[in-house]
């Protein structure tokens, strides 16, 4: 018990009654009760769900420290993708009881297997738009609304070539949409027109909520962005980071 209390930094709480403990302290006591059993595997089922936002962040750090100290397996169940991404070394993404993808946090973010995983992992979530693929002068393009962007050659696989003339789902993460003039001028093949509906200054960055080809898009741009509500602006996609999915199966192409 003393060793578990030392690991969790709750030695000074051992003589207190439960009613005298804060929410975070009670969570650590609960983990201590598990630690003293010296288990080979810890199973945690949404242990942070009843905590406020500030305490939840603090307890995420505590659990990661505990995992590092004990060097044992933790199975952690959560509906919060932020908890999964920040705490997991390997994540199982499930939908309706069916496993969608098992991978590292980095691969789930950069190489999602389907639309569900792509939209679930990441905040703000990935933007999606239905587009038609075409081929002109040896290059493949995705067209949606009045916009047409070129797909980088590195992403044009034989499988993707099979979708020429068909509709697909194109996904792009908010941080891969840029409104600064230098980037736009360097990517003329990836420029789109967008209407600014809402802006949110987040401090180190700004979120732009855009109407683009009839779809709602979110862009995470530099805090120095001059875009204002009601503006029609040009944005450019970082096309080497786009994701393309089959429209019917929603699986990555």
Q: Where in this protein do the model-derived segments appear?
A:
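ABC ATPase nucleotide-binding domains
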Residues: 1-116, 120
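Residues located in well-ordered beta-strands
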Residues: 104, 130-132, 195-197
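C-terminal boundary and immediately downstream tail of ABC-type ATPase nucleotide-binding domains
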Residues: 111-136, 171, 238
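Structural detector for hydrophobic anchor residues on beta-strands
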Residues: 128-129, 192, 217
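Short, conserved beta-turn/loop elements at beta-strand boundaries and strand-helix junctions
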Residues: 137-139, 199-205
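Short, acidic/hydrophobic/Gly-rich beta-strand patch recurrent on exposed beta strands
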Residues: 141-145, 171, 207-212, 220
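Glycine/charge-rich catalytic "coupling/switch" loops of P-loop NTPases
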Residues: 141-195, 225-253
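A short macromolecule-binding patch
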Residues: 150-151, 217-220
């Amino acid at each position: 018990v003393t060793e578990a209390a030392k690991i969790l930094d709750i030695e000074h709480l051992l003589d207190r009654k439960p009613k005298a403990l804060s929410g975070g302290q009670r969570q650590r006591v609960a983990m201590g009760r598990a630690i003293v059993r010296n288990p080979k595997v810890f199973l945690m089922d949404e242990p942070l769900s009843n905590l406020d936002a500030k305490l939840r962040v603090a307890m995420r750090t505590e659990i990661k420290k505990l995992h590092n100290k004990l060097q044992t397996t933790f199975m952690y169940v959560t509906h919060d993708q932020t908890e999964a991404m920040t705490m997991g070394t390997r994540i199982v993404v499930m939908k309706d009881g069916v496993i969608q993808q098992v991978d590292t946090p980095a691969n789930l973010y950069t190489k999602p297997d389907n639309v569900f995983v792509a939209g679930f992992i990441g905040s703000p979530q990935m933007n999606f738009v239905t587009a038609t693929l075409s081929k002109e002068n040896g290059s493949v393009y995705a067209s949606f609304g009045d916009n047409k962007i070129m797909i980088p050659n590195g992403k044009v696989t034989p499988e993707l070539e099979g979708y020429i003339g068909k509709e697909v789902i194109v996904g792009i993460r908010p941080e891969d949409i840029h409104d600064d003039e230098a980037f736009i001028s360097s990517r003329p093949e990836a420029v789109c027109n967008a209407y600014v509906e809402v802006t949110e200054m987040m401090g180190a960055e700004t979120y732009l909520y855009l109407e683009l080809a009839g779809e709602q898009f979110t862009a995470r741009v530099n805090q120095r962005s001059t875009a204002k509500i009601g503006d029609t602006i040009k944005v450019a996609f970082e096309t080497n980071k786009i994701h393309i999915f089959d429209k019917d199966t929603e699986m990555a192409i």
